[in-house]
Amino acid sequence: MSCVKTEGVQTDKNPMGMDINTPEIMQPRAPVKPSKELRNGGRVKSNAVAPTGVYLPNNNIQTPNMTSPEYVQLSTAAALTLGLMPGSMYNCSCTRCLNLLLTYPEGCRANCAYCGLARHREADRDYADRNFIRVDWPAVPMTQVAEIVAKQIKEDGDTPFHRMCISMITHPRSDEDTFTVLKTWTDHVSPDDVMISILSNPTTMVRDDLVKLKDMGTDIFTVSMDAATPEIFDRTRGKGVQSPHTWKKYWQTLEEARDIYGKEKFGAHIIIGMGETEYEALSLVQKIVDMGGHSHMFCFFPEQGSLMDHLPATPRDQWRRVQLGRYLMDYAGVRVEQMKFDELGRVKDFGMPKAELDMLVDTGLPFQTSGCPGKFAEDISACDRPYGDSPVSDIASYPFKPEGAHMRKIRQQLDMEKPGESYEQGEEFDDL
């Protein structure tokens, strides 16, 4: 993938020429059931190829039989930072969050329409070879991961990672194996050196699981609501795509996280551009703020192989407005009731004096990746997910502080250009 390639996805307007993705547009395909021999990791289990250390996803060879808790998958950014695979990222020397993903031959048993890990892909490719948030996820022995980070701390006094996050999936073993993976980690690395987050799977969890994870050192507990409304949730994560998740259970788990972890120690993921209005998205943000939590935003991008890979990415105008609104609500005390919206639910006024708003926009902070904080500041995410929701050619969530041409581009997208300043297409890459 080229750093400056658009990858064929338009992000200024959708096919209807609008700067928002409406429900009429964002309809996933119906899932097709794989043949019986390919279900539940049948290809991997029948061939039973033994794993040998690090496995880099390769759809041209037989995938080894790798299983958590002995094995986990890492984001490409984490693997690069650990030195487990070659390469570099545009304007990023490393990622500050070590994202771990549980792995099984059967894969995730959910069928979320926008996700590259969804169950319907069994016929397409084996679980460990599937793309997720636009990148490959190499598989590595969990002990090896923990030993590398422990060695960094011992020899250098520090590690690039501010935080480690275990991403659970929908699988009968994922609850118990999460405890084992976490124990392997804390046996090597103290939570005082690297903070711990859990990206949970509410469908299989009970309240005692949340308590146990906290007792084991977890700092922040997050829930992937993903959809901004119950209707979109059901269409993309529930019965609409033959998937087991329900809005009710996810919201219940978020409330339990509030009670167990406390203020600002829980959060929810929200994907923008799946058919919700900006008002609906920011109303959900407000509910979470009122609970004492934070929202972690993702910009919808059509994941290759998913049931929504034929749909348009979120128009940047829509994304920037929600991104800015979310930051104002989370960190500047603005409430959704202070904002004004048009008849299509688009933000028309952010509820803040123009001079103050301009100063805040100029910091670039609202447009950086949102997630669990690291060691720099509460409003700077350790989980920077480099280019997980956009190509580099049209960055949605900045894994670095946007300045210069990047800020001019953002201001153009917000229709907030400064007098005498303008953005020229592609100028942010002039010095590459």
What are these regions (language model features)?
Residues C3-E7, D12-G17, N21-R29, K33, ...:
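Auxiliary Fe-S-binding modules of radical SAM enzymes
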Residues A77-R121, E155-D156, R163-I166:
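N-terminal pre-triad scaffold of radical SAM enzymes
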Residues R109, A118-R125, W137, D156, ...:
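Conserved mixed alpha/beta catalytic, RNA-binding, or beta-rich assembly cores of soluble enzyme
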Residues H120-I148, Q152-D177, P191-V206, T218-W251, ...:
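Core AdoMet radical
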Residues Q152-D156, K212-M216, D259-Y261:
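Acidic (Asp/Glu)-rich catalytic clusters
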Residues T178-D193, H245-K263, R316-G333:
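Alpha-helix-loop-beta-strand connector modules within alpha/beta enzyme cores
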Residues M195, L199, T203, K239-G240, ...:
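Conserved strand-turn element in the central/C-terminal portion of the radical SAM core barrel
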Residues V206-L213, M274-D290:
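Catalytic cores of alpha/beta
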